[in-house]
Amino acid sequence: MKSLKAKFRKSDTNEWNKNDDRLLQAVENGDAEKVASLLGKKGASATKHDSEGKTAFHLAAAKGHVECLKVMVTHGVDVTAQDSSGHSALHIAAKNGHPEYIKKLLQYKSPAESVDNLGKTALHYAAAQGSLQAVQVLCEHKSPINLKDLDGNIPLLVAIQNGHSEACHFLLDHGADVNSRDKNGRTALMLACETGSANTVEALIKKGADLNLVDSLGHNALYYSKLSENAGIQSLLLSKISQDADLKTPTKAKQHDQVSKISSERSGTPKKRKAPPPPISPTQLSDVSSPRSITSTPLSGKESVFFAEAPFKAEISSIQENKDRLSDSTAGADSLLDVSSEADQQDLLVLLQAKVASLTLHNKELQDKLQAKSPKETEADLSFQSFHSTQTDLAPSPSKSSDIPSSDAKSSPPVEHPAGTSTADRDVIIQQLQDTLHDLQKRLETSEAEKKQLQDELQSQRTDTTCLNNTEISENGSDLSQKLKDTQSKYEEAMKEVLSVQKQMKLGLLSHESADGDSRLREVRVTDEDVDALKQDLQRALEESKRDKARVQELETKLVEKEKAEATKPSSEVCEEMRNSYCSVIENMNKEKAFLFEKYQQAQEEIMKLKDTLKSQMPQEAPDDSGDMKETMNRMVDELNKQVSELSQLYREAQAELEDYRKRKSLEDATEYIHRAEHERLMHLSNLSRTKAEESLSDMRSQYSKVLNELTQLKQLVDAHKENSVSITEHLEVITTLRTMAKEMEEKTVTLQEHLASKEGEVAKLEKQLAEEKAAMSDAMVPKASYEKLQASLESEVNALAAKLKESVKEKEKAHSEVAQVRSEVSQAKREKENIQTLLKSKEQEVTELVQKFQRAQEELAGLKRCSETSSKLEEDKDEKINEMTKEVLKLKEALNSLSQLSYSTSSSKRQTQQLEMLQQQVKQLQNQLAECKKQHQEVVSVYRMHLLYAVQGQMDEDVQKVLKQILTMCKNQSQKK
């Protein structure tokens, strides 16, 4: 009984109780004092699991309560304790992003390399959560960075999958394996390309990620970048591949031959110009060598659904991707154009040819997607177009922009399918725009170079303290005028090209009027984007022209100042002061202009955003809206033309000013020194130019304010549009409700008037009744003494009732207390009953066990009885055998006697003696055997008796039970055999 009680006590300490519930609640609330008091009580443990497998220690880690952790550690909690899923407190703290808690656990010697059931460390969970501080703390405490979980992921792969770039950078800086693979063979670079994180891709490439690695399905990083549809990542990878290819290729002639072969074998859409992709990889070469496989490969599930439901959106997205790639390619080509030597130019040609080949591949894929339904006849035309476009790009011709549209017009025959024609026209327009933009960029670069030269000349002139001769000044003035003329002519040529492009766009818009409403809307949207791009380029050109003009004016003012300095010949210090003041003024002006230009650009971007929102909010009506969009486009083109005319006027004015300046210079050359009055006049002119510059600044500010006003107006329009679109229905509802309310109010007024009339009649009646009642009351008034007596009697009754009420309240409280006591007694009785029931259940279990033991003992007794019966049978058999043996002995004796009698007569004495001895020996042996059998039988009977007694007493050994069971089975087998 004592051992049973001890067992019950041990089980009670491990069971969940109220203190454990309170401990969980205190940890949930972060009450460290209550946690300390509860842990001091018996039975409460911080690592005890509840029904869900939670513990108070792990809950504190999930909540990040550091004070509770300190209290638990002082009470001797096991820091390495795990919950039902194998998570330690360190894992849970990292999972929930609590760096302070992690730091404390590591200080209390919690192992940083501990692993849960999934093979993950705390660093895996910190990387998945994206907590940079937690990752830093774990790395400082030497948590394994390249340890893989059951899925084959290291913390770097987990951070990339969850899109935490900062954690990725930190892990890479602390020695994470860049080329580590998961179970599917995917590297960190592949996962970063799939998630579309350009920063992480760049960091991985810098850390030496291998771009040629392939996963278990044979896909490389480029494939995953195409899945994410991120053009920036694709261009990054392609540029890296091209760099690696350039480093690896020993000779450039072989590469040139390979590219020329590929470009001759290739067929596809018209090629986009000056694309930066790298030389083709061996996988792409295999794809190119089998064009049938490219065209016959089916699209994936997502792509087929996309093209089936929204083909127009797919076309527009592909065109936009091409534009992005073209913009990237122009930047790459501009950077490549800086090469000067012949060897570098040859390298540049090889690179450009490789990039052209890769672009044709990409364009072919896009065209196959867009023209899946178009007839096969268009493929030959498109291949001819791509071949022609590649040749025109690679041929060194001076007039590229003029040759391209004619070649496209010759090489592109009319196709029956409308989608094919629209895409081809768009490609042609985009090519023309890109060419014109490229030429504009070149010219702007040349103008900037000229400006730099002018600035250098000015600086050299400033450094010279000696006075300049009039001849040198005139030469500088003539050089400036020539340069200004050159820049003006270049600018006019660029503007003419822009105008021609705009006219071509107009013609393209007019030619597409016969198409369907949806195609019109798509074309108008595309041209909208092109016009916006042109607008931006025009504005840049305008701003640069204004800057050029301002620079020219500055140069003129500086020249005038130098001439004045020559006339007056002031000291070098005064010159330097003047120079510094003018430089500071010019710098301030430039800063203000740059600031205003930035604000102007921001305002324009906001206007574009508002226009886009307005377009998205306006209802789309196919034919009417296309006409409206065309009108707006025409207006925008007219505005652009106006701006161009204004620019040309500005340049003419600048030219006129230059001519005036030349005339003045020629007059000044006549005389060696400038007169004081003339000097004052020149000062006046410089002040005028300054005022003009300030006026231009004010104009810029006014333009900026106008743009801001336009912005506010557009915002108001958007708000008004939103309010009207939402509140028209509400307004109608309000009007209807107001009308109904007015009708109801009118009806109520009528009813109220009627009610008033009735009430006035009732008031008159009541006044009459009041007068009558007053008269009756005056007749039936009670005297004051009787009234006071009644009041006293009523007060006494009220007091008595109040006393009774108090007594009843007291009785009620007593009854409540008795009820509470009864309830407590009932609850105690219930608890006792539950305890008794548990004891009863335990006793019943013991009784059932004893009954089972009793049944087993009865079965064993029955078996022993059977064994005793068999033993009695064996004894009887033995008795029978003994009797038979005695009979045989008697027979032998008789035979001996007979033989002894015969021996005297027949044989000699020797033989008789020998036979007698033999027989005697046999008899002795038989007697010995009989004695041994009796002994064995007695021993067996005694053993059986002992075992029967033990079985009756319930003290039989297990070995004996096993032997008895074996005997019973043997007896059963013998009976079955019989």
Curated annotation (Swiss-Prot):
It is found in: Cytoplasm, Cytoskeleton; Cytoplasm, Cytoskeleton, Stress fiber; Cytoplasm, Cell cortex; Cell junction. Residues 248-299, 388-424 are annotated as: Disordered. One of its GO terms (molecular function) is actin binding. Residues 282-299 have a biased composition (Polar residues). GO terms for biological process: cell differentiation; spermatogenesis. The modification Phosphoserine is found at residues 11, 281, 286, 293, 300, 304, 318, 327, 329, 340-341, 358, 511, 514, 666. Residues 248-259 have a biased composition (Basic and acidic residues). The lineage of its organism: Eukaryota, Metazoa, Chordata, Craniata, Vertebrata. The gene is Rai14. Disruption phenotype: RNAi-mediated knockdown in testis tissue results in misorientation of spermatids, indicating loss of polarity. Transport of germ cells across the seminiferous epithelium is disrupted leading to partial spermatid entrapment in the epithelium. Premature spermatid release is also detected in stage VII tubules. F-actin is mislocalized and found on the convex side of the spermatid head, in contrast to wild type where it is tightly restricted to the concave side. PALLD localization is also abnormal, showing more diffuse expression away from the spermatid head. Residues 349-374, 427-945 form a coiled coil. A motif (Nuclear localization signal) lies at residues 270-276. Residues 395-414 have a biased composition (Low complexity). Interacts with PALLD. Associates with actin. However, does not bind F-actin directly. This is Ankycorbin. SUPFAM superfamilies: Ankyrin repeat. ANK repeats lie at residues 18-51, 52-81, 85-114, 118-147, 151-180, 184-213, 217-247.
